């Protein structure tokens, strides 16, 4: 099992699919990485040489923000919005949808389970 960016990559999958197990790398970025390193997309992880794994690791470290650094960046951006007190920050603080969705009905994922209202029993 190859270890890239602190993640164990599955050995029997194709390289493009295996790279998507890293947080911050999707299908498009995985294909870009394979293109820059010069690895065919059909090659499987267990067929890679140690030098190719090192090349992939260096390309990811050099060009992309992944795993813990990416998570930290996103949380710092949200914290910055909350500290500014802008509308989006207030929505994050209250735990409501941020991007303009309706909240009269729905939005249960963001708001949490429904709270019982007294006087609604039959």
From Swiss-Prot:
It comes from the Bacteria. One of its GO terms (molecular function) is rRNA binding. This is Small ribosomal subunit protein uS13. Located at the top of the head of the 30S subunit, it contacts several helices of the 16S rRNA. In the 70S ribosome it contacts the 23S rRNA (bridge B1a) and protein L5 of the 50S subunit (bridge B1b), connecting the 2 subunits; these bridges are implicated in subunit movement. Contacts the tRNAs in the A and P-sites. One of its GO terms (biological process) is translation. It comes from Parvibaculum lavamentivorans (strain DS-1 / DSM 13023 / NCIMB 13966). It holds the Pfam family Ribosomal_S13. HAMAP family: Ribosomal_uS13. Residues 99-122 are annotated as: Disordered.
């Amino acid at each position: 099992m190859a270890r890239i960016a602190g993640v164990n990559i599955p050995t029997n999958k194709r390289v493009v699919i295996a790279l998507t197990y890293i947080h911050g790398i999707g299908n498009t970025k995985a294909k870009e990485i394979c293109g820059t390193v010069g690895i065919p997309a059909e090659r499987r992880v267990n067929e890679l040489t140690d030098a190719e794994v090192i090349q992939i690791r260096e390309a990811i470290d050099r060009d992309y923000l992944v795993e813990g650094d990416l998570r930290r960046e996103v949380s710092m951006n949200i914290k910055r919005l909350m500290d500014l007190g802008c509308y989006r920050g207030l929505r994050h603080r209250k735990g409501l949808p941020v991007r303009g969705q309706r909240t009269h009905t729905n939005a249960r994922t963001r708001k949490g389970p429904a709270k019982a209202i007294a006087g609604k029993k039959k």
